[in-house]
């Protein structure tokens, strides 16, 4: 009967690990989206101030939105 308890404990640990991995992936996704939104806002602010877009921030945004980054979200 003791071995049944160990099996149940092992299954519970595996399920908990899977849940934490999924939560971590969602957390990273949300943080990346926040970073993208901050860069977009910075570009908008600079555009309003100067009347032109900042190339450095636009380039950084393009890197963040590259297809290889989007593949990691799925």
Swiss-Prot record:
Q: How is its activity regulated?
A: Ion channel activity is inhibited by hexamethylene amiloride in vitro.
Keyword Transmembrane helix attributed: yes
Any one biological process term the GO annotation gives: receptor catabolic process
Which molecular-function annotations from GO does this UniProt entry contain?
CD4 receptor binding; monoatomic cation channel activity
List residues in topological domain: Cytoplasmic: 26-74
Superkingdom per UniProt? Viruses
Q: Signal peptide: which range, if any? A: none
Q: What is its main location?
A: host cell
Q: After translation, how is this protein modified?
A: Phosphorylated by host CK2. This phosphorylation is necessary for interaction with human BTRC and degradation of CD4.
The answer on whether this UniProt entry bears the keyword Protein transport reads: no
What InterPro entries is this protein classified in?
Answer: Vpu (IPR008187), Vpu_cyt_dom_sf (IPR009032)
Q: Which residues cross the membrane?
A: 5-25
**So what does this one do?**
Enhances virion budding by targeting host CD4 and Tetherin/BST2 to proteasome degradation. Degradation of CD4 prevents any unwanted premature interactions between viral Env and its host receptor CD4 in the endoplasmic reticulum. Degradation of antiretroviral protein Tetherin/BST2 is important for virion budding, as BST2 tethers new viral particles to the host cell membrane. Mechanistically, Vpu bridges either CD4 or BST2 to BTRC, a substrate recognition subunit of the Skp1/Cullin/F-box protein E3 ubiquitin ligase, induces their ubiquitination and subsequent proteasomal degradation.
- Note from the entry: HIV-1 lineages are divided in three main groups, M (for Major), O (for Outlier), and N (for New, or Non-M, Non-O). The vast majority of strains found worldwide belong to the group M. Group O seems to be endemic to and largely confined to Cameroon and neighboring countries in West Central Africa, where these viruses represent a small minority of HIV-1 strains. The group N is represented by a limited number of isolates from Cameroonian persons. The group M is further subdivided in 9 clades or subtypes (A to D, F to H, J and K).
Q: Which family does it belong to?
A: Belongs to the HIV-1 VPU protein family.
What's the protein name? Protein Vpu
Annotated organism of origin = Human immunodeficiency virus type 1 group N (isolate YBF106)
The encoding gene: vpu
